[in-house]
């Protein structure tokens, strides 16, 4: 059997730090970010299905979210102000992402490639799946800002404002539900969120 470096590369997502130009109280890596995005994307899809008549496969969306940043194992995490400095840079970075995604897919064994390709290549996702994962991605970045700000790190003040605008652009009923039900707890301390459920 031919050796594959696919998962050896993916395991290095934990070595790539997000928010590289900003001082962080707690450093966040791409691997843990991807897990949180998967959880939130699953929740958004489930909320849409349960509350707002959606017909989404929430488990599949969680899987897509797990793989949504895998190309960064080859490209690194380019800071948002650089990535979107102008439309030309944004377009070129998208092209680089596509090349990295294809390179990752090509690392998978031939007999498994058709399984991993549609998880890594966003072009294989439906518009609705893309929208949910993008909402979850922005929500998780916003939650990171709340955590940093609550720890006294004002470095994330502008990022929070920028992400509030992004969330407004991606707004949906399921996001409104998530923001109302789950997000307020991120402003609280461990003692405050543990009061109602002592062990």
Curated annotation (Swiss-Prot):
It comes from Salmonella arizonae (strain ATCC BAA-731 / CDC346-86 / RSK2980). InterPro entries: HD/PDEase_dom, HD_domain, YfbR, YfbR/HDDC2. The keyword Nucleotidyltransferase does not apply. Coiled coil: none annotated. Homodimer. GO terms for molecular function: 5'-deoxynucleotidase activity; metal ion binding; nucleotide binding. Keywords: Cytoplasm, Hydrolase, Metal-binding, Nucleotide-binding. It catalyses: a 2'-deoxyribonucleoside 5'-phosphate + H2O = a 2'-deoxyribonucleoside + phosphate. Its cofactor is a divalent metal cation. PANTHER family: 5'-DEOXYNUCLEOTIDASE HDDC2. This is 5'-deoxynucleotidase YfbR. Catalyzes the strictly specific dephosphorylation of 2'-deoxyribonucleoside 5'-monophosphates. Residues 30-142 form the HD domain. Substrate binds at residues 18-19, 33, 69, 77-80, 137. It comes from the Bacteria. Signal peptide: none annotated.
């Amino acid at each position: 059997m031919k050796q594959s470096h696919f998962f050896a590369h993916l395991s290095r997502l934990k070595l790539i730090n997000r928010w590289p130009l900003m001082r962080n109280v707690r450093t966040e890596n791409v691997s843990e970010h991807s897990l949180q995005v998967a959880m939130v994307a699953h929740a958004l899809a489930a909320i849409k299905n349960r509350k707002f008549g959606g017909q989404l496969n929430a488990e599949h969306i969680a899987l897509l979210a797990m793989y949504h940043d895998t190309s960064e194992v080859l490209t690194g995490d380019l800071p948002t102000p650089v990535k979107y400095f102008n439309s030309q840079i944004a377009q070129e970075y998208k092209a680089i992402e596509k090349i990295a995604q294809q390179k990752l897919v090509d690392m998978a064994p031939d007999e498994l490639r058709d399984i991993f390709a549609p998880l890594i290549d966003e072009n294989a996702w439906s518009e609705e799946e893309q929208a949910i994962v993008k909402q979850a991605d922005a929500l998780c970045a916003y939650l990171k800002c709340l955590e940093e700000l609550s720890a006294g790190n004002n470095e994330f003040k502008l990022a929070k404002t920028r992400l509030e605008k992004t969330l407004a652009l991606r707004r949906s009923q399921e996001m409104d539900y998530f923001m109302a039900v789950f997000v307020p707890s991120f402003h609280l301390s461990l003692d405050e969120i543990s009061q109602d459920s002592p062990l």
